[in-house]
A protein has these predicted regions:
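Sequence context surrounding c-type heme c attachment/ligation sites in exported
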Residues: 38, 52-167
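Amphipathic alpha-helical substructures
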Residues: 1-54, 108-122
Length: 167
């Protein structure tokens, strides 16, 4: 899979490349692309099937967390998930375990309104006192990734609404 190859090459270079620097894991302004993955991401100027190091727009992407493999693994099949993405960063990157939901709290699916943005759908967590206690710890972190669709492509709007990726 192209997304996994991108991340594998990126990490391999950080650990064993000509200038290894693990600090760049989260802020490197480059990745590894071939023509197919560059087209997928909308990055011009990459030709051929071989992966190579490619500079990225630092206003859009930096490091492993903005790569498609991570974005796809922390989303649902057809939509982003601020909850999954925020939980992933809090628990796997910041090593901050989050409490499980109380057993008597039902899972509340987001609003089915097809015209609202993902953020608008998930902001119900903030308004519901039974949900807000835990979701305030992860949803804002996940909102920071809303410029990435469910498979990691950059976007500036969703359903005609500008993306609000503020935390």
């Amino acid at each position: 899979d192209l997304l996994v190859t991108e991340s594998r090459l990126f990490i391999t270079n950080l650990l064993w490349g000509e200038d290894p620097d693990l600090r760049a894991l989260f802020d490197a302004p480059y990745t590894y692309l071939n023509d197919a993955l560059a087209r997928f991401y909308g990055v011009p100027g990459v030709d051929g099937p071989n992966f190579r190091k490619v500079a990225l727009d630092p206003n859009q992407r930096a490091g492993i967390l903005t790569q498609g493999a991570v974005m796809a693994a922390t989303a649902k099949a057809n939509m982003t998930s601020p909850v999954f993405r925020g939980q992933y960063v809090r628990e796997r990157v910041l090593c901050t375990p989050l409490p499980p939901p109380p057993p008597n709290i039902p899972v509340v699916p987001p609003s089915p309104d097809p015209n609202s943005s993902t953020r608008e759908k998930f902001e119900e967590h903030d308004r519901n006192p039974a949900c807000a206690g835990c979701h305030k710890l992860m949803d804002p972190v996940g909102y920071g990734f809303e410029n990435f669709d469910a498979v990691g492509r950059w976007r500036t709007e969703e359903n005609g609404h500008p993306i609000d990726a503020s935390c």
